[in-house]
Amino acid sequence: MTHEPPSHPATELLPPPKPPLAFRVGIVGHRPNRLQAADMALLAGTLRGLLRAVQDEVMEVARSQAALFSNGLPVLRAVSPLAEGTDRLFAEQALALGWDLCCVMPFPQAEYEKDFVGEAAQEPDSLKRFRSILREAAQSGRLNCLQLDGVRTGGNDSDLYGTGGKGVLGLSDMLIVVWDGDTMQDKKGGTAETWVAARDAGVPVVAVDAKAPHHWPMPVVPGGLACLADVRQAVRDAMESKIKAPEPAATALLPAVRVLSEDATDLPAREVLDWRVLFPDRPPEVGP
């Protein structure tokens, strides 16, 4: 009796899953002590209009580049430290539009929350509002938190808050800056410094006047994104600069997607992967 050798299925290459299309907008701005000339309802509307313009353009890019990305809705993420004032107003508008929220805290949460109680607080029920925003995002599965390991020294903690601002910038494809134009009150690590860092990094910036009626770009700032059409074009430019055409996968990646034969024989690959990358697509997934 003769035995036929076992047959082996042909090697099958599985394409990697397509990434979601993603865009992230960060915020830096003033706390209530520098928003005394603001109309908060009007400022909220301005921020909401900017976010909606970004959202509309991302959806348009998703339609035009559908072959490159997963079939789900694009990921839209607001990046905010949730400090009192501008940060929270921005986050609330983003959540109302269905965006995800990434909260970048300059300290571990328990330490950061000390900014929102007692004499340190500048808003009524400040800690309650902070936690309420986090809870709203978490309950809908739209929250990421990045808690930095800043340690207060009892002196000037500007560098620690500045590190938080750099974290926001590093996780943002576009930055909205709400500034009052008063350079005399600017502090190290504050709004203006993060703005300069964004400019140096080539991140598109929308500069909104912290004073009513909240013009943008601010009258004191030449150039910049001057209208919603500019904002939408900046979104498209930022996204298209990160979309790579399909290219052969690295050899090291092939074993991860190759279906091996029953006896684990590593057959030569006869195809290349259809590999598409959008980078960066998501911030670190850190629990609240």
Where on the chain are the PLM-derived regions?
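Acidic/glycine-enriched connector segments
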Residues: 2-244
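Non-membrane alpha-helical secondary structure
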Residues: 39, 227, 245, 249-252, ...
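Charged, amphipathic alpha-helical linkers/stalks
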Residues: 235-262
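Basic, amphipathic N-terminal segments
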Residues: 253-288
